[in-house]
Amino acid sequence: MRHPVRFLAVLMAAVLVTPALLTAQSATEVDERQAFFDEIQAPNWLGTDIDHTPIKRQRGGSCWSFSTVAFLESEVLRTNEDVVAALKEAREDLDLSEYYVVYWAYVEKAREYARRKGENARFTDGGLSHDVTWLVEKYGIVPEADFAVVEDYSAMRTDLNAVLKAHEESGDWTEDAVVAEIREVLDRHLAPPPETITVAGQVMTPIEYATEYLALDPAAYWEITSYTDVPFYGRGELDVPDNWWDYDGYYNLPLDDYMQTINQALDAGYPVVIDTDWGDKGASWNGAGIAVIHPDQLDGAAIDQASRQLDFVEGRTTDDHLVLAVDHRVVDGVDWYLIKNSHGTSSGRRGYVWIRGDWMAMRVLAYMVHPDALDPSLVDQFGGNR
């Protein structure tokens, strides 16, 4: 069963509310919100031992690509000494194209939409980390310099939707025709994806660049979650709208193991890309750069497997945003996670956010990490299958 969409009930009172009163109330709410965040003792540093690339500013609903491409960049920096040496010599940062991945995501979404004849199909901006690794495995990746950044995301979306609307009206769901028309729109707003690129004087395909030059193994990574509708130490689907092709390969852990695993991974120097909720009272991503569980959200409940499950089922936890975790610190016995966001350096804490352990336990739906970061005993629980 799909969990319900979060909604806001608005109660209308039979009183006259003046603009001045509204302004005063708004100011009070802002002051209370600021006071709440001022009292949160988040770490005041932004340093980390996990190498990662500079903060970017996404356009449109492509956080899933920005975060997971940043994750792959960080993985290259962690594992590929030759690429790191070449970057240092050239005084450059590794900069892979998020929109190359977005291009192929829309192609595959259109293909799936046509196969389902528009029924129970999703053609939205959203996506998840496994979309990126699957697409990089299938189509490779290219440097940012070799593929355009979209100039008007809204206009592109309008034109893409118009293609599907025309096919809905005609009833013609010929897959090749739908994909060809979608690609024409993408070629116009972005660019035709290159068949070859030149890197360090070598001509190579995007797949060769990904798997040989960067030495990425996109299929190696695990997505881990913690919900009770799938047996623990089994694999299943994360039932959220952005899982548009119903991927069912998530590894499901009990909450204690789920938390221990991400802590262990970050402490050992592995980057982790996380799928998180966005809009609680205790979160100020672009302002204070803090995300914690506000006491009002708990209503006296403990933070445990049952409350995590309940908030997911009842729609209080939704998959709103994907970001990259690049550090874990324990301050006065409290877990904190340093997050590289994709809203530019003017948001949050110079583009970073500190997530507290309670938020990680309650509002982070899943994360992707290299299985080498896992305790071998956990891998054994899954039959040793990496």
What does each model-identified segment do?
Residues 91-200:
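Papain-like cysteine protease catalytic cores
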Residues 49-61, 117-124, 171, 245-252, ...:
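Second-shell loop/turn segments in exported
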Residues 31, 180-386:
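Active-site signature of cysteine proteases
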Residues 26-49:
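N-terminal regions that are enriched for targeting/export leaders
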Residues 62-65, 97-103, 132-135, 143-145, ...:
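Structural recognition of the beta-strand scaffold that forms the well-ordered cores
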Residues 1-9:
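Bacterial N-terminal signal peptides that target proteins for export
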Residues 9-20:
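Bacterial N-terminal signal peptides
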Residues 64-80:
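Alpha-helical support elements that line or immediately flank enzyme active sites
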